[in-house]
Curated annotation (Swiss-Prot):
This is Formamidase. It is an enzyme of class 3 (hydrolase). GO terms for biological process: putrescine biosynthetic process from arginine. The keyword Transmembrane helix does not apply. It comes from Pseudomonas syringae pv. tomato (strain ATCC BAA-871 / DC3000). CDD domains: aliphatic_amidase (cd07565). Gene3D superfamilies: Carbon-nitrogen hydrolase (3.60.110.10). PANTHER family: FORMAMIDASE (PTHR43674:SF15), NITRILASE C965.09-RELATED (PTHR43674).
Length: 338
């Protein structure tokens, strides 16, 4: 499917998404965090000016906080804090949907790596805490809100995952299973992950008949180098549009969720998300609907264990300078209501 020349030729059923390859910041004070927030607010305005037909502007993971992995309380955000208020107001002012990243204060443990989808009236439509922090490098609390989906612009259904989440095929499958026709993936990845980034963005799309829109931070903060690499993939796994390494570029593409829905209903061969739960339906009525996967049954029972479990070297964050944790996992209540 064509990209509509980056949304310049918008079709009646199209959803135009911009992926912002935001320059990598390095804030260590509240003032620096606020300055970076204002930069993102300015980029929301730029998105609207540069493409009047854009429906949604997506910012990468770490777009406010950079890659320092600092958990300093003075630079953590909250859902009702000034940074989130400013981002919501920007969407409302410029009548555009936005996807934003925050490191969220957690009084019961380590901060959460969280993301929001805000509509063009400034309302939070989706709130997600990263399920799979990039261990052993990242110190964030494991997410505890599942994988939500929300109604998006122009009849789309959106899901949002963060960076390392996309390396687990179960994440994209859950997004699609809950009805998402477009999955957003925001990241701070650096160059060594480039190949894995591309093939997982494509496989996540193809195996779920879902369009994916993915973007990393971009450029250098003097220590780390993020890669940009904005990428749109169609539901058949083909790349529709992609960016390079130019910081602060907004890469745009028109997606067609109506064609995703059509494929999910009408495809026979490679309708994998349906066939996963209806194995061999040519031979048996409705297909086999059991669960033949040992790892799924074990995970559900709290007994997930690899044959080489005892030999795994990295099982905490000590190799990256973090203390061995003593707390067991316990979900943290959220004040946000859908």
């Amino acid at each position: 499917m064509a990209s509509g020349l980056g949304g310049l030729n918008k079709s009646p059923n199209g959803v135009v998404i911009g992926l912002a390859q935001l320059a990598l910041p390095d804030p260590h004070t509240r003032e620096a965090l606020w300055a970076q927030t204002q930069k993102v607010v300015g980029m929301v305005a730029k998105a609207r000016r540069s493409n009047p037909g854009m429906d949604l502007i997506v910012f990468p993971e770490y777009s406010l906080h950079g890659l320092s992995m600092s958990t300093a309380p003075e630079i953590m955000c909250s859902l009702d804090g000034p940074e989130v208020v400013a981002l919501r107001e920007a969407c409302k002012e410029h009548r555009i949907w936005g996807c934003f990243s925050i490191m969220e204060a957690n009084p019961q443990g380590n901060p959460f790596n969280s993301s929001l989808i805000v509509d063009d009236l400034g309302e939070i439509r989706l709130y997600y805490r990263k399920l799979h922090p990039w261990v052993p490098v990242e110190p964030w609390e494991p997410g505890d809100l599942g994988i939500p989906v929300c109604d998006g612009p122009r009849g789309s259904t959106l899901a949002l995952i963060i960076c390392h989440d996309g390396m687990f095929p179960e994440m994209a499958r859950e997004c699609a299973y809950k009805g998402a026709d477009i999955m957003l993936r925001t990241a701070g990845y650096t160059a060594p992950i480039r190949h894995s980034w591309k093939i997982t963005n494509q496989s996540n799309a193809f195996t779920n008949l879902m369009q994916t829109a993915s973007v990393c931070m971009c450029g250098s903060d003097g220590t780390f180098d993020s890669m940009g690499e904005a990428m749109f993939v169609d539901f058949d796994g083909t790349i529709m549009a992609e960016g390079g390494g130019r910081a602060d570029e907004i890469v745009c593409c028109e997606l067609r969720p109506d064609l995703v829905r059509e494929a999910r209903v009408h495809w026979g061969v490679e309708n994998n998300i349906y066939q996963f739960g209806h194995r061999g339906y040519v031979a048996v009525k409705g297909g086999a609907r059991d669960c033949p996967y040992t790892y799924m049954r074990d995970l559900t029972a709290g007994q997930y264990r690899l044959p080489w479990e005892n030999d795994v070297v990295h099982t905490d964050g000590r190799s990256c300078g973090f203390a061995t944790p003593e707390r067991e996992f316990k979900p943290t209540p959220s004040s946000w209501k859908e």
